[in-house]
Amino acid sequence: MKKITLLLFFYSILSCGVKQSTNQLNSGNYDEAINIAVNSLRNNKNAKGKQDYVYILEEAFAKAKERDLRNIDSWSKDANPTNLEQIYNSYVQLNRRQELIRPLLPLKLLKEGRDAIFPMDNYSTEIIDSKNALSNYLYTN
């Protein structure tokens, strides 16, 4: 009886974690969904019971990256120097997100028989350029 109760307890905790990360993903809190999924996948990332986290992580990563790049593009076109800090912070966030996921790779999607797709880009040039532009702006003003 104790074993059954213990198993039900752990199952409920695991299902709540998936539900919580799904809610974060659906509400647009992509970074929080990524953090929840990464923390869950740190131990035994290829376990069948953790496949939901892999799907959530793949979708949240793609949506967060797309949102950040769209915002950067918009801020760059605006050419308003007050946006330089947001541009710099977005590039740093893009890089941080990749470095958070990189140790887990490759992640398998067992149902589809493929690896999860996480397109990694090198943002070091953009980070340095935006940091220099921000520094110049702050220095002159």
Region roles according to the model:
Residues F10-I34:
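Bacterial Sec signal peptide processing site at the extreme N-terminus
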Residues Q24, I36, I87-S90:
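Alpha-helical solenoid repeat scaffolds, predominantly canonical TPR units
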Residues M1-I4:
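Positively charged n-region of N-terminal signal peptides that target proteins for export
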Residues L41, K45-N141:
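Post-signal peptide N-terminal segment of secreted/secretory-pathway proteins
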